[in-house]
Amino acid sequence: GRLSSGMVLVDRTHLHLLIRDDGCGVFARIQEAFAIDTPQQALLELSKGKLTSQPEFHTGRGLFFTSRLFDVFDLYANHLTYQHSHWQRREWLRANPLAVQGTAVFMSIALSATRTLDEVFAAHSRGSQDFSFARTEVALRLAIGAEGQTLESRAQGKRIAHRLEAFEEVDLDFDGIDAIGQGFADELFRVFARQHPQVQLRARNMNDQVAAMVAQAR
């Protein structure tokens, strides 16, 4: 793209920022750079953190930590919307995304917010004295999309597990996932876990059916 713009608005209670450009869209850019099948899969990879197509210029941490610093973080591109809200502590795809040319980012934070960037770093690091990016979170609802596909196959398990060996701890959030297949669970919780024993996988927000399938795989 050739054009970019930004806007800052401060009202009585919040600071709002909007940044946009007219490029190809961040998810399409990542899809092309990393030979990923779809923009939605590119969104999933971006949400994990440590993903950059230009490592000489940035580390790939910016989106992950910025989305957790602000109260509301919305990323619009390629007919997809990635959203993260501080109070719900979750990530999701919007069913009716905003159609924009290029990429648009909206961020909002209450003027009364007290959390600091150091606190955000510490929540995903080895400890208070080491801010290395060691912990990530993967919202599995991002893998099923707004249409609600199921997580059944071994290939889907590999897609979720891709690059997780770059982290020491991974929280797998099953919020919004009603069921998973045996192949998916086995690939993620047995095959990947045995190949990368240094990575601690934690499954949370599971219903009884999902928990039983995960326990069987382990």
Which residues does each PLM region occupy?
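Conserved beta-strand-loop-beta-strand hairpin that lines the nucleotide-binding pocket
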Residues: G1-D118
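Intrinsically disordered, charged low-complexity linkers and terminal tails
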Residues: G23, W87, F106, V138, ...
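Short acidic/polar alpha-helix capping motifs at helix-coil junctions
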Residues: A28-R29, A123-S125, A211-M213
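Intrinsically disordered, low-complexity boundary segments flanking structured domains
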Residues: R61-G62, W92-A95, A123-F131, R190
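A general structural signal for short secondary-structure boundary/capping elements
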Residues: L63-T66, F121-A123, Q216-R218
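Short, conserved, surface-exposed binding loops centered on an aromatic residue
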Residues: N96-L98, D130-A134, H162-L164
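Short, cationic low-complexity segments
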Residues: E119-L142
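Amphipathic alpha-helical interaction surfaces in cytosolic regulatory modules
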Residues: R141-R218
